[in-house]
Each structure stands twice: as structure tokens, then as C-alpha cells.
UniProtKB/Swiss-Prot annotation:
Entry keyword annotation includes Manganese: yes
Protein name: Fructose-1,6-bisphosphatase class 3
InterPro entries hit by this protein: FBPtase_class3 (IPR009164), Metallo-depent_PP-like (IPR029052)
Keywords: Carbohydrate metabolism, Hydrolase, Manganese
Family: Belongs to the FBPase class 3 family.
Gene3D superfamilies (UniProt xref): 3.60.21.10
UniProt xrefs under SUPFAM superfamilies: Metallo-dependent phosphatases (SSF56300)
Catalytic reaction annotation: beta-D-fructose 1,6-bisphosphate + H2O = beta-D-fructose 6-phosphate + phosphate
Metabolic or biological pathway, per its Swiss-Prot or TrEMBL entry: Carbohydrate biosynthesis; gluconeogenesis
GO MF term list: fructose 1,6-bisphosphate 1-phosphatase activity
Species in which this protein is naturally found: Enterococcus faecalis (strain ATCC 700802 / V583)
One family name in Pfam for this protein: FBPase_2
Entry's EC annotation: 3.1.3.11
Any single biological process term in GO: gluconeogenesis
Length: 626
């Protein structure tokens, strides 16, 4: 920071102290997007219902329900909605005049809690000066009213109304939410995580807490062959190989050829029904065989990690060396194998890749690390994401903090050192950064730790004793499929346990919370997202369509503004086209969690504390120079 003279110091101190007394901006929390771009994009566009609330507050005496719906959708989808309205009937001069006036009023209301400087930075370059005049100099009782009227009239007469309204709409979207928190799992079974990443990269202010599915993509890019196999297997399982081929330019020709030559029809490996597009019969056959091939490659690679990392304590997960013909024996039980596809598994060296398998996985890694679009997305994740974040008296973490049954922190040993609680998650963060920094290394300790984060018992992202992928594919006995959850998930409804976790992460304040994602809230079974008397909140977004029959809703999001915390339960989203055509918003039900006695100000926030330090440092500097 440049050295300031006395006058500049005085100006900066006054500015900082003034900012501290503005209302805190609105934070928007989402999680578990699972590649469902359209639903997520809609939630961003409507601010989890905040824009509709603003429209209703400002115009409830002026507009009927249909008119308010139309105004909302002009804000959500300005290009598409305006084109639709133009096609239905010519939009009159009076319509444009009223619409612009209303949108400017929403902008004015939405910008009240921000400094003029911050709003100016958000203004579109083309209309920056005009909008600043309309926002800050407006007073309909003064002689300037004709001045404002002339600005709007000229915009319409010059044929710029559509463009101006579009800019206003996106400005409202930006002002209504100050900061976005994405609490994990951008990636998974949904078809368009790449579009979500593009959307996030254009967002004005955000942070990301990594989920387990984000981790395997980052790990694959960082050199983990086992995680790379998992990524490809999941894409094949959910009929999303086009994500790799078309969106990330990964050539799967060699893998497909090997799969078709080596594996037979095996219905257990048929891709799940894709809710967005019907796969052709040829695509289904390819996905079925690719899934078999990559599942076996995955088992071999994971066995290699377990063999070279005894301190991971995962030897009980080894399976390929336990196969005897059509049976397998482990945990003192013998089972008959089903859906067998072990053609490339050697009895002598079951975890050794064949020459073709090795060529395929090595080639896939080279392509992953060379894909321009994937590189852009993974760099952005590393720039914005972490395993947890403490922000405004809230601990944001996707999965869990591993606990013992008595609520104490579970300890795990890595490289001869024991880690538990916050230190355990910090260790994993260190391993992530180390592995990402050396992508050419595929079997180093840090890279193997990223795979452990995907499926290890002590992982804060996984939160279970074991991942039963092998059992689900190859054993009929349902009891072997069960994945035992860490005690965290039964203890997180206990205030004492949550308080201990918050203390561990040095989260202070009267209204502190843990905000979790990862686990769908089964509302149909009476489960609540509010745990431990409101100390912990679960906001699994429920965007994945496959979960919605289980949960009964399309998940939760959270808003945290100057008036407190507000949990929002969402109904399912039909489609973008249907929504725009029928003004069909996502139906949301809001529930106030915390409402402080006094309105929260910037000085009560994490950023506010930093601004206060800057002000105090400047004041100290002034005194020293006197």
C-alpha cells in the first residue's frame, strides 16, 4: 500500500469508519449443485427469492400478481423474456417507460446499503454515468424531475431500451447478493458442472468449500490416477461421457475401443437414466462397457495406493486378491460374485494394470492436464476453494469433522504424526496444495492423500467408514452395501458437540453456526435441516433430481443479511424454457433462524474487522508522525 500523507490518512480513516456503520451485505449460501446448472442458475438469478421479495415490497400497491411475476422474470432472464414479450405484441413507449422506472427504483433500493464507490464499480460501463445520476440524484419533488424524465425518454427514442433494461436487470441481480458461498460438490452426476464453473468464474464475489466430488476432479487433474478412474466411471455411470468428450475435449477413443473388445454386455453396468437426454442404444452399450473397464482399472489403482500407504489403514478394503473363481471371501464371510467382469485381473498380481490399461489411464491423465477448459476450471477452484472457511461467525464445511462416539475428535496418523480436529483438516489442505503444485507426480504421498480424501475413513469430505463401490457392483447381499457414517452425523444435533467444534476452529460470537452440505435432508421422513437448536444448519441444495424423490423437496439455501439468517426450502425446478414462458418461479418457503436484537452492520463482519484494523493502523501512524 502506498504511503499516505496526513490529509489522505484523515480521508481514509473517515471513509473506513463510515463503511463500518453500513448494514452488512447479503450472503447467499448454496451447496451440492451436482452439475445441475439450470436450477442453480435460476437460484442465482432470483437470489433465493430475494428479488421477488423486493418487487413485492416496492410494488404491492401498484402491480397485480401477474405483473409482479412478469417484472421478476424480466430481471431474472432479461434477454429471453423481453424477446418473448416483443414476439407476443409490440412493447409500447409507455411500457418501456414504466418498466425502466420500476427497475431503476429496485436498483436504488438494492444499492442503499453499499457505498457509492462500490455501486459505481458494479455499474455497466456503457450506462455508468446515466445510472449514477438516476440512482443518487433522483428526487421527484425537485425541478430535476424533467432531467430524469428526459434521460429515460431519450434511451427509449434512441432504440436502447432493451439493452438498458437488460443492464438494469443484471445490475439488480448483482446488488441483491453481496457474496456467494458454495459449500461443495459442484461436480457429480449432473450434466453441466462445466457451465456452473463458467457461471461462478463470472460471479462478482464468492468462495467455495470443496466437496468430495470436487476433490476427485481436482485430484485427477493433480495426478491421482485412482481419482481419474473414479471421475470417468461416474461419468459413464450417469450417461455423461459427453461432458468429458465434448465439453472438456477428452478423447475417449482408446478407452472405448479397449472396453468394446474386452467386455461383454452386463446390465448391472448400464448407465443410469439421464433425465436431460435419452441415450441412444449405441451410447448405452459403450457406457456399459466403459464403466466395466474403468471400474476394474479403479480397483487396481486403489489397491496399489493401499499397498504403498499402510498408514491409511485401508487394507480391509482390498478385494481383488480375495477372489477365488466365482466367490470372494473377506471379513470371515464367503460370497458369490455377481456381474463379474474380471477378465484383466491376474491371480498372481491382481492389482497390476495390463499394458493396455496403463496406456489408457496414462493417456487420460495427459489429456486431463492438457485440456484448456479443464485447466481453467481447476485453477479457479484452487484459487477460490478450501476445505473449510470461517466467515462472519460461521464455520462453512462441506462434510464433517471426524468424531469418536463420545464426541471427541478422532485422531489419524499420517507420516508418523497424529492429527485430529482442525489440525486434521489443515493437514489435508496442505496435502491438496502440495499435490496440485506437482501434477507430474502420480504416486507421491500428497497425491495419494487426495484419493484418501475421497474415500478414507478419516476424511472430512467422505464421513463414512468405507466406500462400498465393489460390493454394490459385485455382491447381491444388501448388508454388504451399507456404508457406516461417522458418529459426527448422529452427534451434530447435540449443542455441546457443535460448540466444541466451533471452539476448535476459533469461531467466536453469540450467533455462531456450523453450515454443512453433503447429506440430503429427508424432509419426507420428518428430518429437519436445523440441528442443535439452530447451532448447525444443513443446506444440501438438493439440486440433483435423483435425490428429490428421497428428500421431498429440491433442497435448501441460506440467506444471511443485516436482519439475520433465513433458511429457504425450494420446490423442484421444471426447466428454464418453461419457467420463462409461464413466469414459473421456484416456489420457496422461508424460515427465520436467527434475528439479532440489533441490525447487523459491516463492523460485525469478518471484512469489517479487517477494515477496523486498517483504520486503527492509520490512526496509530498519524499519532507517530505528530
Amino acid at each position: 500500500m502506498a504511503t499516505l500523507n496526513r490529509d489522505q490518512q484523515i480521508e481514509e480513516i473517515i471513509n473506513l469508519e463510515a463503511i463500518l456503520n453500513l448494514p452488512k451485505g447479503t450472503e447467499h449460501f448454496v451447496s451440492d449443485l451436482h452439475g445441475e446448472f439450470e436450477a442453480f442458475d435460476h437460484i442465482l438469478r432470483n437470489g433465493s427469492g430475494r428479488i421477488r421479495e423486493k418487487v413485492q415490497f416496492l410494488f404491492k400497491q401498484e402491480l397485480n400478481a401477474h405483473q409482479m411475476d412478469e417484472l421478476c422474470f424480466i430481471i431474472y432472464y432479461p434477454e429471453e423474456k423481453l424477446t418473448l414479450l416483443e414476439n407476443e405484441s409490440a412493447l409500447s413507449y409507455e411500457w418501456w417507460l414504466l418498466t425502466i422506472r420500476r427497475l431503476v427504483e429496485i436498483v436504488r433500493s438494492s444499492s442503499m446499503k453499499y457505498t457509492r464507490s462500490k455501486v459505481r464499480k458494479a455499474l455497466p460501463e456503457t450506462y455508468g454515468y446515466i445510472l449514477e445520476e438516476l440512482i443518487y440524484q433522483y428526487d421527484e419533488t425537485t425541478t430535476k424531475n424533467g432531467y430524469y424524465q428526459q434521460i429515460i425518454e431519450k434511451i427509449i427514442l434512441l432504440g436502447e431500451a432493451k439493452r438498458f433494461v437488460t443492464e438494469l436487470a443484471y445490475l439488480i441481480q448483482r446488488l441483491i447478493i453481496d457474496h456467494l458461498h458454495v459449500i461443495g460438490d459442484i461436480y457429480d452426476r449432473g450434466p453441466a458442472p462445466d457451465k456452473i464453473m463458467d457461471r461462478l468464474m463470472s460471479y462478482h464475489s464468492l468462495d467455495i468449500q470443496l466437496g468430495n466430488h470436487d476433490m476427485i476432479w481436482l485430484a485427477a487433474y493433480s495426478g491421482s490416477l485412482a481419482c481419474l478412474a473414479n471421475v470417468v466411471r461416474i461419468c459413464a455411470r450417469y450417461g455423461n461421457l459427453d461432458l468429458l468428450e465434448e465439453r472438456y475435449a477428452i478423447d475417449l477413443t482408446a478407452l472405448k475401443k479397449f472396453s468394446l473388445e474386452t467386455y461383454k454386455e452386463n446390465p448391472a453396468f448400464a448407465p443410469k437414466k439421464n433425465p436431460y437426454r435419452a441415450l441412444t442404444e449405441a451410447e448405452k452399450q459403450v457406457a456399459m462397457r466403459v464403466q466395466q473397464a474403468i471400474a476394474i482399472i479403479q480397483e487396481k489403482l486403489e489397491g496399489q495406493i493401499i499397498g504403498r500407504r499402510p498408514d491409511f489403514n485401508l487394507a480391509h478394503r482390498l478385494r481383488l486378491d480375495k477372489i477365488q473363481g466365482e466367490t470372494i471371501t473377506f471379513d470371515e464371510c464367503r460370497y458369490t460374485l455377481i456381474n463379474s467382469c474380471f477378465q484383466t485381473v491376474s491371480e498372481e498380481q491382481p492389482y497390476q494394470l495390463t499394458r493396455e490399461e496403463k496406456q489408457i489411464i496414462d493417456d487420460l491423465l495427459t489429456q486431463f492436464q492438457s485440456s484448456p477448459r479443464l485447466t481453467k476450471h481447476m485453477r479457479f477452484l484452487m484459487e477460490k476453494a478450501s476445505l473449510y472457511l470461517v466467515y462472519n461467525q460461521n464455520l462453512l464445511i462441506h462434510g464433517c469433522l471426524p468424531l469418536n462416539a463420545d464426541g471427541t475428535f478422532q485422531a489419524y496418523t499420517f507420516k508418523g504424526h497424529s492429527y485430529s480436529g482442525k489440525a486434521l483438516v489443515d493437514f489435508f489442505q496442505e496435502m491438496l496444495e502440495e499435490a496440485y503444485a506437482q501434477p507430474a507426480s502420480t504416486d507421491d504421498y500428497a497425491t495419494d492423500c487426495l484419493w484418501y480424501l475421497w474415500c478414507g475413513e478419516g476424511s472430512s469430505l467422505f464421513g463414512k467408514r468405507a466406500m462400498k463401490t465393489f460390493e454394490r457392483y459385485f455382491l447381491a447381499e444388501k448388508e454388504t452395501h451399507y456404508e457406516e457414517k461417522n458418529p459426527y452425523y448422529s452427534l451434530r444435533d447435540t449443542v455441546e458437540v457443535c460448540e466444541r467444534i466451533l471452539d476448535e476452529f476459533e469461531v467466536t460470537g453469540e450467533n455462531r453456526h456450523i453450515i454443512n452440505g453433503h447429506t440430503p435432508v429427508k424432509r419426507t421422513k420428518g428430518e429437519s435441516p436445523i440441528k442443535a437448536n439452530g447451532t448447525l444448519l444443513v443446506i444440501d441444495g438438493g439440486f440433483s433430481k435423483s435425490y428429490q424423490t428421497i428428500t421431498g423437496i429440491a433442497g435448501y439455501t441460506l440467506l444471511y443479511n443485516s436482519f439475520g439468517l433465513q433458511l429457504t426450502a425450494h420446490k423442484s425446478f421444471s426447466s428454464k424454457e418453461t419457467a420463462i414462458l409461464n413466469n414459473q418461479d421456484i416456489h420457496s418457503i422461508k424460515q427465520v433462524i436467527d434475528r439479532p436484537l440489533q441490525r447487523l452492520l459491516v463492523k460485525d463482519t469478518t471484512i469489517g474487522k479487517e477494515l477496523l484494523k486498517q483504520s486503527q493502523a492509520l490512526q496509530k501512524q498519524m499519532k507517530q508522525n505528530q
